[in-house]
Amino acid sequence: MSLCSPTHSAEMSLFLQGPEEMLPLSSEGSEMGSEKEQSPEPHLPEEGEGGKPWRVDDSEGSWIPPGEKEHGQESLSDELQETHPKKPWQKVTVRARELGDPIAHPRHEADEKPFICAQCGKTFNNTSNLRTHQRIHTGEKPYKCSECGKSFSRSSNRIRHERIHLEEKHYKCPKCQESFRRRSDLTTHQQDHLGKRPYRCDICGKSFSQSATLAVHHRTHLEPAPYICCECGKSFSNSSSFGVHHRTHTGERPYECTECGRTFSDISNFGAHQRTHRGEKPYRCTVCGKHFSRSSNLIRHQKTHLGEQAGKDSS
């Protein structure tokens, strides 16, 4: 009598294909080479038609006659025939993925940002970006320029800065001797000396020294401001203005003066402050010739001349 006995594994059941001979028994009634004490063998039913053995239904633990399929194994046996050709004495392991069973995998969401800054609550999708951001709060600036010693919190900012040392500045202002890499930058700078603001907004009348600045301003009249502060509800027409404003809520001051250590949230104020150390006063009043380090101070000063002129006209 032969028996096809399924055994269990961690993946799926193992099936014996082909006949299996019963091992001869020793004089003590145990199989050769096995343990001496064996559990009593279950009672086997008589052989079915053609001398074929009955088999154990693995799912229910009952005996089934030859020729019939086990419960729930109709599709399994078909797949075994297709993917695993029958060979005598071959054990076939059927894995769940071979049968097309779904295997759950954790999904990675592209917009998931599980790393949170403990200082301001901003979220990031990886620890590297979080560490770079946290340098704003800690003031850490590990990337140092080899030419001038200036330090930066990001390596990309240091690389951008080092290009300044590599590029020559051919265009020099005759008024203050400041040099520029592009002629257009020199022209814009000279307009500041003259107090000229040739680009005027046709809606509100505000004037600007650069056409690009006028274009940014003009959008505030024509388009709804798309950048809205979630803290106070104030809206802005461009991301740079929104970024400067948002730092007033977070307290971030990423621009640090290397001379005195003073920090600023706005790069324009930072640039104006640095002129005080260099003694630069590029903004000149065309009426009295007085110079200023900030364009806003020049405009405020020029209003005094307009007031004097208005007083003369009234008298």
Swiss-Prot record:
SUPFAM superfamilies: beta-beta-alpha zinc fingers (SSF57667). Pfam families: zf-C2H2, zf-H2C2_2. The keyword Nucleus applies. Residues 1-10 have a biased composition (Polar residues). There is a cross-link at K113 (Glycyl lysine isopeptide (Lys-Gly) (interchain with G-Cter in SUMO2)). Residues 33-58 have a biased composition (Basic and acidic residues). A zinc finger (C2H2-type) spans 115-137, 143-165, 171-193, 199-221, 227-249, 255-277, 283-305. Gene3D superfamilies: Classic Zinc Finger (3.30.160.60). InterPro entries: Znf_C2H2_sf, Znf_C2H2_type. It comes from the Eukaryota. It is found in: Nucleus. Residues 1-90 are annotated as: Disordered. GO terms for cellular component: nucleus. GO terms for biological process: regulation of transcription by RNA polymerase II. GO terms for molecular function: DNA-binding transcription factor activity; RNA polymerase II cis-regulatory region sequence-specific DNA binding; zinc ion binding. Its main location: nucleus. Keywords: DNA-binding, Isopeptide bond, Metal-binding, Nucleus, Phosphoprotein, Repeat, Ubl conjugation, Zinc, Zinc-finger. The keyword DNA-binding applies. Belongs to the krueppel C2H2-type zinc-finger protein family. May be involved in transcriptional regulation. This is Zinc finger protein 691.
